[in-house]
Amino acid sequence: MWLYLAVLLGLYYLLRWFRERQVVSHLQDKFVFITGCDSGFGNQLARQLDLRGLRVLAGCLTEQGAEQLRNQTSDRLQTVILDVTKTESIAAATEWVKECVGDRGLWGLVNNAGIFHSHGYAEWIKIETYRDTLRVNLIGVIEVTLSMLPLVRKAQGRIVNVSSILGRIAFFGAVYSCSKYGVEAFSDILRRELQHFGVKVSMVEPGYFRTAMTDWQKFSEIMKQIWKETPAHIKETYGQKFFDAYHDLMKQGLLSCSTNLNLVTDCMEHALTSVHPRTRYSAGWDAQFFFVPLSYLPTSLADYILTRSWPKPAQAV
């Protein structure tokens, strides 16, 4: 019985491996638009796809980021300034992309731009921070996608949305997790609604990686500032000892982030270039072998595993 199941499982993975190795033809004629290319995953993906021969259209927040990217890539790569929180910026970028791609349409749209404001417990964070994060990480994804969707549909192309393992299992960073759960839901709906148009939608769910968003020094400074601005009655509820212990816990986690960004960008590239892309990509060993399996456990068991090492607030019962 077990041998039979093992053989079936082996055949399944062999078939999946074979299907996923099939590459889309004429990649050199495909246009891919990527948001958030100033640094991090977006910057690396832009350079990676440029080396592969694709026609990369890179959305950057700053002219400095755009210039640095152009200096590191071939003449094929083009840049545009894009602020995903501004409707007029998205509209202008869409018109620019339309002119670039012509009648071919847009093969790939990668929604990568994001911010990371997860520097404390949920009630420490100001409501403005929740709004700002959702405006970039969720509303920005939705608005860019809806604006460029006709171009993607014309090419029967791909949409790749960068979520997070915190969009699969929420245990830290209420602000960020809320935005990424929204990206997951939006992507699932898009995938089902667009299947009849030949458009494929994938999500990439990275674990912990070292980028500008997870730089410990900057993270620590913001975290201390947030704690300083937290109302006194809330600070009394948790206590300074709790904050110090929580601060050290965050330090351990962020300093252990993976530096191999290719684990993420390779997933993005596969979603854009494979004939049979996956629906979800869990990027990083922590995501694949800890957080994703954890997400399938009973909630009470997952809660225990995740929080057993957390410090206790001063007024805990």
Curated annotation (Swiss-Prot):
It is an enzyme of class 1 (oxidoreductase). Keywords: Endoplasmic reticulum, Glycoprotein, Lipid metabolism, Membrane, Microsome, NAD, Oxidoreductase, Signal, Steroid metabolism. The active site is at 176 (proton acceptor). Its main location: membrane. It is found in: Microsome membrane; Endoplasmic reticulum membrane. It catalyses: all-trans-retinol--[retinol-binding protein] + NAD(+) = all-trans-retinal--[retinol-binding protein] + NADH + H(+); all-trans-retinol + NAD(+) = all-trans-retinal + NADH + H(+); androsterone + NAD(+) = 5alpha-androstan-3,17-dione + NADH + H(+); testosterone + NAD(+) = androst-4-ene-3,17-dione + NADH + H(+). It is a peripheral membrane protein. NAD(+) binds at residues 33-57. Pfam families: adh_short. GO terms for cellular component: endoplasmic reticulum membrane; intracellular membrane-bounded organelle. PROSITE patterns: ADH_SHORT. SUPFAM superfamilies: NAD(P)-binding Rossmann-fold domains. Residues 1-17 form the signal peptide. It comes from the Eukaryota. GO terms for molecular function: 5-alpha-androstane-3-beta,17-beta-diol dehydrogenase (NADP+) activity; all-trans-retinol dehydrogenase (NAD+) activity; androstan-3-alpha,17-beta-diol dehydrogenase (NAD+) activity; androsterone dehydrogenase [NAD(P)+] activity; estradiol 17-beta-dehydrogenase [NAD(P)+] activity; testosterone 17-beta-dehydrogenase (NADP+) activity; testosterone dehydrogenase (NAD+) activity. Belongs to the short-chain dehydrogenases/reductases (SDR) family. NAD-dependent oxidoreductase with broad substrate specificity that shows both oxidative and reductive activity (in vitro). Has 17-beta-hydroxysteroid dehydrogenase activity towards various steroids (in vitro). Converts 5-alpha-androstan-3-alpha,17-beta-diol to androsterone and estradiol to estrone (in vitro). Has 3-alpha-hydroxysteroid dehydrogenase activity towards androsterone (in vitro). Has retinol dehydrogenase activity towards all-trans-retinol (in vitro). Can convert androsterone to epi-androsterone. This is 17-beta-hydroxysteroid dehydrogenase type 6. It comes from Bos taurus.
